[in-house]
Structure formats: C-alpha cells, structure tokens
Amino acid sequence: MFFGTYTPKLDDKGRLTLPAKFRDALAGGLMVTKSQDHSLAVHPRAEFEEMIAEISAKAKRGNPQARAYLRNLAASTDEQYPDAQGRITLSAEHRRYANLTKECVVTGSIGFLEIWDAQAWQDYQELHEENFSAASDEALGDIL
C-alpha cells in the first residue's frame, strides 16, 4: 500500500527517483499511465495486470466510450523497471500530459502512486482542501 507525499526532482533526462519506501513494492516492474486531473498513475505491474484483466472482462466492447477508454489506457501506458538508484524515466508524452517541471510531487494513493507537477498539486490541494470533510462524507458515507 502506498501512503504519504514526497517531493523528488525530475532530472534533465526525464528521470524521477521513487521514494525509497516504495522501491521494494515496485521492483518487479511498474506501469505508468495517464491519470485524472493531469497527473500520472504508477501501478505495480502485477496489480496493473489484474486490473486490466478485470476491466477487459467487464468492458462492453460495443460501447464507443468503453473502446475509447481501453484504447487510451493501452496507448498511454509505459512499462518501467526502476534502475539501481530507484529512478524511472518518464516519457516525453507523460511529462507533457502532466505538465511536469523539475519540481514534482509523488503521492501515495493506497493501491498506486500519483505523480504531479508541484504547482498543480498545490493548486489541487488548495481547491479541494475545504471540501475534504464533505467529500469524505459523500464518498464514503457510513464506512467512516
């Protein structure tokens, strides 16, 4: 499971050092894909494969939106293996999509990581901070 917020820097070659505490969970490979809110999602490879199998089994191939989603997901996914220093190389397209600059934020999102441009993360936090309690009540209802 992935929790916490970290602030690694993106180097000139597009490499990002993953937080040390997550490296063991990602050592078997990881999948980087576009996510919501112009961020990137980083999934452990095995868990991503399970997710894709479930999505593929349930997707209604006759539905144009389902086909578009699957097509986009497959096209925007990049398999990576962290190097000895725990770095991954983010593609130019992923860096463009997430507007990544040198200053980045990596957040734990329970089952996966998110990579954000630092300013975009700050803006997102400011926009949603006041609504956190209301959103948790609405999204989680009686669970909490």
Swiss-Prot record:
Coiled-coil region(s): none
Entry-linked CDD domains: MraZ_C (cd16321), MraZ_N (cd16320)
Q: Where in the cell is it found?
A: Cytoplasm, Nucleoid
Gene3D superfamilies for this protein: Transcriptional regulator MraZ domain (3.40.1550.20)
Please provide the record's keywords in A-Z order: Cytoplasm, DNA-binding, Repeat, Transcription, Transcription regulation
Fetch the Pfam families from UniProt: MraZ
Q: Select a single GO molecular function from the record's annotations and give it.
A: DNA-binding transcription factor activity
Any one biological process term the GO annotation gives: negative regulation of DNA-templated transcription initiation
Query: What domain of life does the UniProt record list for this protein's source?
Result: Bacteria
**Boundaries of each SpoVT-AbrB domain copy?**
5-47, 77-120
Its GO CC terms?
Answer: cytoplasm; nucleoid
Spell out the InterPro entries in the cross-references: MraZ, MraZ_C, MraZ_dom, MraZ_N, MraZ_sf, SpoVT-AbrB_dom, SpoVT-AbrB_sf
Q: Assembly and interactions?
A: Forms oligomers.
Family stated for the protein in its record: Belongs to the MraZ family.
Supply the name of the protein. Transcriptional regulator MraZ
The organism named in the record is Mycolicibacterium vanbaalenii (strain DSM 7251 / JCM 13017 / BCRC 16820 / KCTC 9966 / NRRL B-24157 / PYR-1) (Mycobacterium vanbaalenii)
